[in-house]
Amino acid sequence: MPSPRRTIEGRPLGSSGGSSVPGSPAHGGGSGGGRFEFQSLLNCRAGADPACARLRASDSPVHRRGSFPLAASGPAQAAPAPPPEDARMNLNPSFLGIALRSLLAIDLWLSKKLGVCAGESSAWGSVRPLMKLLEISGHGIPWLLGTLYCLLRSDSWAGREVLMNLLFALLLDLLLVAVIKGLVRRRRPAHNQKDMFFTLSVDRYSFPSGHATRAALVSRFILNHLVLAIPLRVLVVLWAFVLGLSRVMLGRHNVTDVAFGFFLGYMQYSIVDYCWLSPHNVPVLFVLWNQQ
């Protein structure tokens, strides 16, 4: 005789006989046990019966694939996949980025320390009027007006040639500085006071220093094309250096603004010297100027 089958609830089911429980759906029918077992499987709820939950979990395709192994079933867990190469590179900052950030921090700190004439209440506030006078000596407007006046008053071809190239150098300096300032758009230091002499819209930016570029350009131009005594030559170099330093002391620029300005002005003279205007390469310009 075959052993009686048991339902998930633990009660015996007769294969052909009646159920021991009166009023059950399997009572009095040969196929009632099969219907009772089928309905019991349909009516079981997840979590209500542990056996049903285990049955449903074991029959699921995800469990059969082994995508979610039990913590206690295996001796060791699978090692996590290593991050991709790009992610590992992004987590480690480059040496160049660290160097640039360090240089910027040193630049801001040193510029603030050297801004001793940024205001009347600063450490060297009493020297501020003298520094502002030095600021005017390196402004572009006085240099342009002075060069034009000397060019009009000159009566020699050699003098006009030198002055015309100086005018060309000053215009080139204004153009290059304005373009770079518009591209970089670096704000002036926070301790700067807005009392500069004759500023334009682009002058609200600080990189590079126009006074520093002009000082380097003009001093190199004068030393190469004017015959001066040694004390005057030393005075020209000293003027250019003090003018650049005054930009930081007044709080107008950072140290890197002035340093790059000196470099740019030095290179600008090389451009002017390469494109030197003379009666031989641009005779029309000198003839027209001579007729004025």
Swiss-Prot record:
Phosphorylation by PKC activates the phosphatase activity towards presqualene diphosphate. The active site is at residues 211, 253. The modification Phosphoserine is found at residues 24, 67. Residues 181-189 are annotated as: Phosphatase sequence motif I. The chain crosses the membrane at residues 132-152, 162-182, 226-246, 258-278. Residues 246-257 are annotated as: Phosphatase sequence motif III. Residues 10-25, 69-79 have a biased composition (Low complexity). The record marks 257 as: Stabilizes the active site histidine for nucleophilic attack. InterPro entries: P_Acid_Pase_2/haloperoxi_sf, P_Acid_Pase_2/haloperoxidase. GO terms for biological process: farnesyl diphosphate catabolic process; geranyl diphosphate metabolic process; geranylgeranyl diphosphate catabolic process; innate immune response; isoprenoid metabolic process; phospholipid dephosphorylation; positive regulation of neutrophil activation; protein prenylation. Its EC number is 3.1.3.-, 3.6.1.-, 3.6.1.68. One of its GO terms (cellular component) is nuclear inner membrane. Residues 153-161, 247-257 are lumenal. GO terms for molecular function: isoprenoid diphosphate phosphatase activity; lysophosphatidic acid phosphatase activity; phosphatidate phosphatase activity; sphingosine-1-phosphate phosphatase activity. Keywords: Endoplasmic reticulum, Hydrolase, Immunity, Innate immunity, Lipid metabolism, Membrane, Nucleus, Phosphoprotein, Transmembrane, Transmembrane helix. Its main location: endoplasmic reticulum. Residues 1-34, 66-86 are annotated as: Disordered. It is a multi-pass membrane protein. Residues 1-131, 183-225, 279-292 are cytoplasmic. Gene3D superfamilies: Phosphatidic acid phosphatase type 2/haloperoxidase. It is found in: Endoplasmic reticulum membrane; Nucleus envelope; Nucleus inner membrane. It catalyses: presqualene diphosphate + H2O = presqualene phosphate + phosphate + H(+); presqualene phosphate + H2O = presqualene alcohol + phosphate; (2E,6E)-farnesyl diphosphate + H2O = (2E,6E)-farnesyl phosphate + phosphate + H(+); (2E,6E)-farnesyl phosphate + H2O = (2E,6E)-farnesol + phosphate. Belongs to the PA-phosphatase related phosphoesterase family. Magnesium-independent polyisoprenoid diphosphatase that catalyzes the sequential dephosphorylation of presqualene, farnesyl, geranyl and geranylgeranyl diphosphates. Functions in the innate immune response through the dephosphorylation of presqualene diphosphate which acts as a potent inhibitor of the signaling pathways contributing to polymorphonuclear neutrophils activation. May regulate the biosynthesis of cholesterol and related sterols by dephosphorylating presqualene and farnesyl diphosphate, two key intermediates in this biosynthetic pathway. This is Polyisoprenoid diphosphate/phosphate phosphohydrolase PLPP6. The gene is Plpp6.
